[in-house]
Amino acid sequence: MNSNKMTINLALFGMTQSGKSSAGNIILGSTDFHSSFAPCSVTRDCSLGRSCHFRSFMRRGGQEVTLQVQVLDTPGYPHSRLSKKHVRQEVREALAHHFGQEGLHLALLVQRADVPLCGQEESSPVQMIQELLGHTWMNYTAILFTHAEKIEEAGFNEDEYLREASETLLKLLNSIQHRYIFQYKKGNSLSEQRLKILERIIEFVKENCYQVLTFK
């Protein structure tokens, strides 16, 4: 293994039309994942995308590191066409296939900022994360809020938004040590969005001492 190169492995989870595939494309700087508005679930299968190599993006042990990001996109959960059992099995197999040995650095729960996270809704994607990642899931999970520009349009800033959040969301944030990222589209180029998201992801991975979750 080349100590001057590093691969960060991510998996995206979330409800249908939460913006998972679009967020994955922004992180990768590509159009690997099909993303579109639809009245039903768009993603039916798990898919792995890889970014180009980022040179001198970060330092580790005093040396510059070339970074590559791998992102696993997963079907929405619950899905409009597939059973919960089918989706869980599909994702379980994909995690084992792609990250079985290399390990997963971070699971991103993709949540629309303009859709309140309530108890019944929270039970689905979060429940799947808990089941598939195991009892240490909270150490490897962060929330990615998409459509964050809606917060500003409503007259809130990020802190005010979180203070007014549902009890369900606040409990979830507490359990994952307040790891969250806001994704803005309005007024930001794709490269700016990507850079800000990647910087936060690297921050979380560093705080976790670069540990990974492996799958058998």
Swiss-Prot record:
Lyase keyword on record: no
Pfam (any one): AIG1
Record organism: Bos taurus
Top-rank taxon: Eukaryota
Annotated keywords: GTP-binding, Nucleotide-binding
Domain named AIG1-type G: residues: 5-216
GO molecular-function term, one example from the UniProt record: GTP binding
Gene that encodes it: GIMD1
The protein's name: GTPase IMAP family member GIMD1
